[in-house]
Structure formats: C-alpha cells, structure tokens
C-alpha cells in the first residue's frame, strides 16, 4: 500500500473538482492530488467529443456510472435512469452541453436562508463571468476570458428552431435574446458549452488542459475513493482503490469531496459521516451523526412532447447510419456541420401561473423525435419539446447499501410525490400544445405523436407522465448548504462539525436551480475556490435583472391563436 502527502486531496474530477484543482494549483506552493474513478477524456473518442453524439456515453459504462433508482412509487414503480459522468470531466463529459445558469431569483432565494446571505445573484454573477468565454463577446452578464467555451446559437441553423421560438411568442410568452442575461423568462437561443472548433467544452478541456502540466498537481485516474480518513474530527486523508491495489493519501490542509449529488453523500456515509442509524445498520463506525447527508435529493423530471414534421427539415436523416460517416468526417476535419452542435439550440422558460414568482417550466426544443439517451427514435421526420418543471417540492434520498465502494447506493428521488407536481405537469402539457398550434409552426406541424391528441383529461395526462416522464439528469441538493438541522455544509462548503473537510459540487445546493446544472456547479466551485485560497471574493456587481412582480405569465390577448377550450 502506497502513502503520499498533499496539501489538498480532491475526490472527483468533474465539473467542480476540475475547477478546484486548477484554481488551487495557481498557487505554486500548494500541492493537490486529484482522484478520478473513471479514465481520461480520450480526445479521439467521438462519443464524448462530438456534440451531436451526446447520447452515446449514456448507452455504455465507460463514461457513465449508470445508476438506477429504486422503484419510484409515483411513477408506476419504474426503476429510472440516473446517469452520472465517469472520467476526467465528470458529468460535463457526458451532459447535453446546455449552458443555463439558472434564474437570478434562484440565488436571491438561496440568500434568504440563514448564513447564505452572500449567495445572491449579484454575488454569483462575477463567478459565472470568470468561468466563461462567450463566442459573441463579453458584456455585463457574460465573460470573455474564462476556461469554459460558450457558443451561442446563430440564426439559420434549422428553421424549426426559429419557428418554435416564434410560436412561443405568438402564444403570448416573452421573447428573450439571452437566457443567461437580463431576462431568463421567455423563448430564445440557447447557449452551449461547445468550443469554436465544434468540440465539447468539458471542464477537463477548459480547466485541466491549462493545469495538468503543473508540477504541483497530480492527477490519478481509475482511482475509486473508498473512504475519508479522520484524526478525531479532522479529515486527514483518503484511501482509494486502483484495481486490486489500495493506496492512502494524506492531506495537510483539506479533503475536498467533489463526487456529485449521488457519490458525495455515498462517500461521506461510507466514511462514517451521515445519519447515525443508517451507518450503524452497516456496522460503519460513526465519526459524526449528520442526518442531512443523502437527504433533500432533488432532480428535474421532463417529458417529450413530439410531433410529426410535414417538411423534410428535421434531423431524421442524420439518424441513419449511411449518412453518419459524412457528418463525422466534416466534424473531424473542420469542426463544422451537424456533428458540431448538440442541437439544443433554442428553448425557454415560462411561468404557468401568474403567481409563480419566476419560471417553473423549462423547454428544450429539438428538431427530431427521439429520447435523450438515443432510444425510441420515431421513424419519420419529427420534432419535439423537452418540457419539465423546475422546482418540484418532492424530496428524495441517497442511502448506502453496503461498505463496498463498488456497490451503487440506494437512490430514491420520490418523483411526483406532491399535488403541485401533477398540477405543473398538466399545465406544462397544455401550455406546450398551445405553443405548438401557433401559425409559426403551421407549415411543419403534423399530428401529435406523444402524448397523442386523444390524451386530454387530467387522468389521461397523469397516466402519460407516470409512464413516460424521464429524468433530465440533474441530481442535486443531497448535502445542502445552510444552518438548519438538515444542512450538511456551511456557506463555504465546510462540513458542519468537522475540520478539514468540504463538499463542493451540485449536492450542496439548498434548492435546485431553474435549468441545467453544469454552469451553476462550475460557478459554485469558482466561488468556493476563492474562499479556500483565502482570497477576497470578487466584488458584487450591480446590473439589472428581470423580476416579474406579479405580471401576467402570458399575454393571452396578444396570442395569435387563442387557447382551445377542452
């Protein structure tokens, strides 16, 4: 068994861990060990590097932990997918590359929690900007020199994108030019983590590429963290497995857990930090009975509302194997063409009720009818909207099954456990149908494929959701920040009741954000990195941002085609 010593040990080279490894080693006298259970982000592997190939990593286990939930009691007892990234880049290596920061009011709401006063939107915005290089240039809301390449959709990519945005506006919802700028609410182009050369902009590419040659950073892949070591109440190191070999590394300063919303609570529990009764049931010595570890688990659930396309403008031909070599060759040689896009180039956020303070529904528009993981492709030209609610009141948990680090934990999101969940999904389906029936889509819109035009009553819509809704792959909040009885970490990611131990990833969100989670996770890591380094936080900015303040969610009077009566 080998033993070495570092200032910091980071468990997990994902969206947060790579940020910390890069920022901490900017100080040349600081040594960092970065442990990653997966392998390298092989740059020759089109499955992770080609944006259009985003479904492929979810279909195997080289890059995907392929977790599965326990039977979900409100979803026909289905065991549902819970894909998580494995390899340098973590989930930024296999995600959909949608760059969505969340709504300003998400962070303002966090800041109302005791101890989180410095997590307002205006406190967080400088760190979003620090991380970003946006292809159309910086402004008050966007960065121009950060590690993460962000590409903004341009007009003319596919007529369906513009038609779907126009349809949203014709239905009475706002148009927004920037879902990450002044106003998230509305429909518009979607930013994506794609490089100017058409490659996936994972945090391995953006952050580790600039840091991996530093002599004070050691990156160890295929290293599965087994447990955190403690000297009394202080984290002192980590034991990890590389194949059949066990190694131990000691931390002079801190152990930083960045393993994600599933594996971070799993590692803490395996190390003796978590609900005492759970640990004792597995004969794990209790270092600290911390009841919130693994609780408060949240996710986004979504549906695919699919339509036949009457004109041959969808991506359907690109799904055929005989067309894919040409697409792949153009992407490989030039970084252009269909392979260079994730094809989530338009979307939006709406409120379904006037009393919703900020958007509760997200849309991703896609010019093909297919499941996110590449399954169940409709054999015809089609298009779809991915539609889901943003802040479900339902809460789940991550619970250790055994002491074996190779065993997956018990995961229960408890999807659709509350009455509000059902109301929001019914509202979302009906709102989507109103959008899809607007004149902008008349030339393209054929019959409704899913749920199908005959699916109308509350009971029928609920049955569709139970049978067909899927995860958006946004697990979070299972080691939440705060100071209540179920909080796990403080506002700087430090685990309550212990020294030398932090959690820094999407698990520390107190409440899930409105949209995709990669951008907020990077921001969280950038912000806490300054705290770890003892640096003065970036100054709070002063820019305006949209607040509805009770304004109508939809201007029905301006809708080109009025709502149907059911």
UniProtKB/Swiss-Prot annotation:
Pathway as given in its UniProt record: Amine and polyamine biosynthesis; betaine biosynthesis via choline pathway; betaine aldehyde from choline (cytochrome c reductase route): step 1/1
The UniProt record lists the keyword NAD = yes
Amino-acid positions noted as binding FAD in the UniProt annotation, renumbered to this chain: 7-36
Q: What EC number(s) are associated with this protein in UniProt?
A: 1.1.99.1, 1.2.1.8
Where is it found, in Gene Ontology cellular component terms? membrane
Q: Which reaction does it catalyse?
A: choline + A = betaine aldehyde + AH2; betaine aldehyde + NAD(+) + H2O = glycine betaine + NADH + 2 H(+)
Show the disulfide pairing: none
Recite the UniProt keywords alphabetically.
FAD, Flavoprotein, NAD, Oxidoreductase
- Which top-level group of life is the source organism from? Bacteria
Q: Which PANTHER family match?
A: CHOLINE DEHYDROGENASE, MITOCHONDRIAL (PTHR11552:SF147), GLUCOSE-METHANOL-CHOLINE GMC OXIDOREDUCTASE (PTHR11552)
Member of which family?
Belongs to the GMC oxidoreductase family.
Job description of the protein? Involved in the biosynthesis of the osmoprotectant glycine betaine. Catalyzes the oxidation of choline to betaine aldehyde and betaine aldehyde to glycine betaine at the same rate.
What is the protein named? Oxygen-dependent choline dehydrogenase
Q: Which organism is it from?
A: Burkholderia cenocepacia (strain ATCC BAA-245 / DSM 16553 / LMG 16656 / NCTC 13227 / J2315 / CF5610) (Burkholderia cepacia (strain J2315))
